Curated annotation (Swiss-Prot):
A motif (Nuclear localization signal) lies at residues 736-739. This is Polymerase basic protein 2. The keyword Plastid does not apply. Keywords: Cap snatching, Eukaryotic host gene expression shutoff by virus, Eukaryotic host transcription shutoff by virus, Host gene expression shutoff by virus, Host mitochondrion, Host nucleus, Host-virus interaction, Inhibition of host innate immune response by virus, Inhibition of host MAVS by virus, Inhibition of host RLR pathway by virus, Inhibition of host RNA polymerase II by virus, mRNA capping, mRNA processing, Viral immunoevasion, Viral transcription, Virion. It comes from Influenza A virus (strain A/Port Chalmers/1/1973 H3N2). Plays an essential role in transcription initiation and cap-stealing mechanism, in which cellular capped pre-mRNAs are used to generate primers for viral transcription. Recognizes and binds the 7-methylguanosine-containing cap of the target pre-RNA which is subsequently cleaved after 10-13 nucleotides by the viral protein PA. Plays a role in the initiation of the viral genome replication and modulates the activity of the ribonucleoprotein (RNP) complex. One of its GO terms (molecular function) is RNA-directed RNA polymerase activity. It is found in: Virion; Host nucleus; Host mitochondrion. Influenza RNA polymerase is composed of three subunits: PB1, PB2 and PA. Interacts (via N-terminus) with PB1 (via C-terminus). Interacts with nucleoprotein NP (via N-terminus). Interacts (via N-terminus) with host MAVS (via N-terminus); this interaction inhibits host innate immune response. The keyword Cytoplasm does not apply. It comes from the Viruses. The record marks 627 as: Mammalian adaptation.
Length: 759
């Protein structure tokens, strides 16, 4: 009561009433907002009124020694009054102008290095091309995009360690630089930023821009790579778009693009091998993209694409919980269902076993060119709202949704038999069978779906079976909208499992991804992809298989040679010879293999017939299961360049050419590397007879009798010594080996010993 009296008393004074009613700040919340906390609430206003004052800036006392009190025009540059609450000086904006014109000049060498991201951006814009502006409705959908062109892909923690090491090397705190990229970047930046005078904090901020991927969830119509996002405000408005071609590529976009291509190639190749999961892992681990190991990129790169996610799942990494069907990413936004096996009959009376989802569910569907909201019940499509770039894209989304709904009229619309197979020639599962069928031709599906009258709803139109828009009628439950559906924004990742056929499931057992979902689109990678795995040799065609097979043998010749002599079967079964088999005509593979294996056996048995070039040349043919036959061949055929080409068993051919003088091997005219023959072969096979199975002891010793010829050697007993005539009439003392196992090393040690013995 007392308070009210007091207030009444206050209000009776006319001035109080005037203040409280006429001034805009009559709300406690507002007063509180502008008077509490250190955070500036209206920075631009503050800036304006500060700059209207004479000395709005405070500076260190040293400024008074470095800047004169007045400029040429006699205007005061700083005040003798010190700033309240600190020992700084009050300074006029004119002092800044004076400093910019007359102040000391420091080296500018570090600016382009520290502000690299900005300098690069200017270059891209300078060389970019802006096209015409078009006015049209923009279907924008929010997507998670990379807003920071030109960055490396370090995690926040890794980047923090690099920044601390580069900018504050003497600060305390444990920093562990482990990854290849961390070490390279640290070394590079330390060298670049030696004697850098730019404020360390600024350097740290700029480094962060260079090292870490920053993503935002933005409305986009059109290109989503970072070089397009940086000009988003210039290229698309609410009702207009401006054509733009970036003036340069950036490493991060190139990595994303090349990673997708590598992952697709690897998943497609793994799917057709005997053990898809093992093959996939082997390929991921042996592939490099732009010189960086693919597995390192997969660990750091957040790109979400079907093939990339399958590779990540195989490596035990978490991936997004959304699932993929028909090239669309589905995310359940509400509802739930249970799965039950059901048998259904197609229009052709073929029985299909499908896993029916029972229950009401809502999904968002996001594809490259169309998006949709889907509401479905058990085997019934309740509503589908689609938006897309064009008629074709909208139709694709409708087909996928109709198949996904599992409606009976869709299954009855099948004409003919369903027998689609995947790359490994295995039948696809029923849902993908249906999808492939209608993607080929959806006419019957759309005709049989049913039509309904529609109400006029803003921003929505109906669509008829021939895909024409209509305001009166529409296919049942289906509408086309002007507004896009946003991509799923969450960056949450879940633990998944993968089976040996590369099907990825979440912890409830729902299939999120399978090789069928991997796009068949072929692209050209922007960064060099190096597949070291023999499984990927065929990606560039038969010639590449041929060259790679021979290069592999040459690179591993030392081990191959030992296996050739001690454990040939193991050698013949090596997976590196698998791709080569596809080049050998099927009908004759077995005979070739039998012939080459027999030839090799003779080489092992008969001293002096070991021939490096010939073994390398014929080895890949021995890998096929051999057929025993008495056939002899003087040449073997391989299918390259669209026809059969011959490899001569003895001698050179355009396919396989070894130049003894230069020691270079060329395959189909392409250099395949240097081939060092065994030293014992160069003197026309004479020395090799000595070496294999004999130990050279030194110079000739008369007490062991006259020099024997090569042929007489075979009569020696194990451990017996003799003088032998070798090569160009030199005589050396040898001993027949007591053990056969050491025969192989003879070839290597022999030459040295012969040279020593002769000299």
């Amino acid at each position: 009561m007392e308070r009210i009296k007091e207030l009444r008393n206050l209000m009776s004074q006319s001035r109080t009433r005037e203040i409280l009613t006429k001034t805009t700040v009559d709300h406690m919340a507002i007063i509180k907002k502008y008077t509490s906390g250190r955070q500036e609430k209206n920075p631009s206003l503050r800036m304006k009124w500060m700059m209207a004052m004479k000395y709005p800036i405070t500076a260190d006392k040293r400024i008074t020694e470095m800047v004169p009190e007045r400029n040429e025009q006699g205007q005061t540059l700083w005040s003798k009054m010190s700033d309240a609450g600190s020992d700084r000086v009050m300074v006029s904006p004119l002092a800044v102008t004076w400093w910019n014109r007359n102040g000391p000049v420091t080296s500018t060498v570090h600016y382009p290095k520290v502000y690299k991201t900005y300098f690069d951006k200017v270059e891209r814009l300078k060389h970019g091309t802006f096209g015409p502006v078009h006015f049209r409705n923009q279907v924008k959908i929010r997507r998670r995009v990379d807003i920071n062109p030109g960055h490396a892909d370090l995690s926040a923690k890794e980047a923090q360690d690099v920044i601390m090491e580069v900018v504050f090397p003497n600060e305390v705190g444990a920093r562990i630089l482990t990854s290849e990229s961390q070490l390279t970047i640290t070394k590079e930046k330390k060298e670049e930023l030696q004697d850098c005078k730019i404020s360390p904090l600024m350097v740290a901020y700029m480094l962060e821009r260079e090292l870490v991927r920053k993503t935002r969830f933005l409305p986009v119509a059109g290109g989503t790579s970072s070089v397009y996002i940086e000009v988003l405000h210039l290229t698309q408005g609410t009702c207009w778009e401006q054509m733009y071609t970036p003036g340069g590529e950036v490493k991060n976009d190139d990595v994303d693009q090349s990673l997708i291509i590598a992952a697709r190639n690897i998943v497609r190749r793994a799917a057709v091998s005997a053990d898809p999961l093992a093959s996939l892992l082997e390929m991921c681990h042996s592939t490099q993209i732009g010189g960086t190991r693919m597995v390192d990129i997969l660990r750091q790169n957040p790109t979400e694409e079907q093939a990339v996610d399958i590779c990540k799942a195989a490596m035990g990494l978490r991936i997004s919980s959304s699932f993929s069907f028909g090239g669309f990413t589905f995310k359940r936004t509400s509802g739930s269902s249970i799965k039950r096996e059901e048998e259904v009959l197609t229009g052709n009376l073929q029985t299909l076993k499908i896993r029916v989802h029972e229950g009401y569910e809502e999904f968002t569907m996001v594809g490259k060119r169309a998006t949709a909201i889907l509401r479905k019940a058990t085997r019934r499509l309740v509503q589908l709202i689609v938006s897309g770039r064009d008629e074709q894209s909208i139709a694709e989304a409708i087909i996928v949704a109709m198949v996904f709904s599992q409606e009976d009229c869709m299954i009855k619309a099948v004409r003919g038999d369903l027998n689609f197979v995947n790359r490994a020639n295995q039948r696809l599962n029923p849902m993908h069978q249906l999808l492939r069928h209608f993607q080929k031709d959806a006419k019957v599906l759309f005709q049989n779906w049913g039509i309904e009258h529609i109400d006029n709803v803003m921003g929505m139109v109906g669509v008829l079976p021939d895909m024409t828009p209509s305001t009166e009628m529409s296919m049942r439950g289906i509408r086309v909208s002007k507004m896009g559906v946003d991509e799923y924004s969450s960056t949450e990742r879940v633990v998944v499992s993968i089976d040996r056929f590369l099907r990825v499931r979440d912890q409830r057992g729902n299939v999120l991804l399978s090789p069928e979902e991997v796009s068949e689109t072929q692209g050209t990678e922007r960064l060099t992809i190096t597949y070291s795995s023999s499984m990927m040799w065929e990606i560039n065609g038969p010639e590449s298989v041929l060259v790679n097979t021979y290069q592999w043998i040459i690179r591993n010749w030392e081990t191959v040679k030992i296996q050739w002599s001690q454990n040939p079967t193991m050698l013949y079964n090596k997976m590196e010879f698998e791709p080569f088999q596809s080049l050998v005509p099927k009908a004759i593979r077995g005979q070739y293999s039998g012939f080459v294996r027999t030839l090799f056996q003779q080489m092992r048995d008969v001293l002096g017939t070991f021939d490096t070039t010939q073994i390398i040349k014929l080895l890949p043919f021995a890998a096929a299961p051999p057929k025993q036959s008495r056939m002899q061949f003087s040449s073997l055929t391989v299918n390259v360049r669209g026809s059969g080409m011959r490899i001569l068993v003895r001698g050179n051919s355009p396919v396989f050419n070894y130049n003894k003088t230069t020691k270079r091997l060329t395959i189909l005219g392409k250099d395949a590397g240097t081939l060092i023959e065994d030293p014992d072969e160069s003197t026309s096979g004479v020395e090799s007879a000595v070496l294999r199975g004999f130990l050279i002891l030194g110079k000739e010793e008369r007490r062991y009798g006259p020099a024997l010829s090569i042929n007489e050697l075979s009569n020696l007993a194990k451990g017996e010594k003799a003088n032998v005539l070798i090569g160009q009439g030199d005589v050396v003392l040898v001993m027949k080996r007591k053990r056969d196992s050491s025969i192989l090393t003879d070839s290597q040690t022999a030459t040295k010993r012969i040279r020593m013995a002769i000299n």
